[in-house]
């Protein structure tokens, strides 16, 4: 197995130990930031790589939909952050602070799902991350706040 693959000019290196052992780790631009992308697939076929590119492109094109899905389930985070920061944080402030911290893509056929963690800057989530899941049919849901 090759220990490196190139996807759209980005190097992905095979992780031989640790939490992502057996997966390829690289960086891609998501929502204007260099973001860790974990790509797990047994065969590094062209079809699998195209699926990864499709998922990342979809995420870049659907930022507003992702943020809307998060806010729909977690609107109370604004009040929590306002209390923690002892200042009024508006919904726009909170939305503007959200970014994708990392993305995990496991290619398993046509309906492959992927997940990613939303983070904030400033740290309105107080060290936590919001895990988001996108189904093979591109349905978005928040799987909870971790950390």
Language-model segments: residues:
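A sequence-level detector of short linear motifs
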Residues: 36, 90, 141-142
């Amino acid at each position: 197995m090759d220990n490196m693959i190139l996807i759209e000019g980005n190097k992905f290196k095979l992780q031989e130990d640790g939490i992502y052992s057996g997966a390829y780790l690289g960086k891609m631009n998501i929502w204007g930031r260099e973001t860790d992308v974990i790509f797990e697939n047994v065969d590094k076929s062209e079809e699998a790589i195209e699926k990864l590119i499709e998922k990342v492109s979809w995420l870049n094109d659907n930022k507003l939909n992702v943020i809307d899905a998060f806010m729909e389930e977690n609107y109370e985070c604004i009040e929590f952050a306002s209390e923690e920061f002892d200042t009024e944080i508006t919904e726009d402030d909170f939305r503007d602070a959200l970014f994708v911290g990392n993305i995990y893509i496991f290619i398993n056929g046509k309906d492959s799902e992927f997940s990613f963690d939303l983070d904030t800057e400033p740290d309105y989530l107080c060290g936590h991350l919001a895990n988001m899941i996108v189904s093979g049919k591109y349905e978005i849901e928040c799987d909870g706040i971790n950390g």
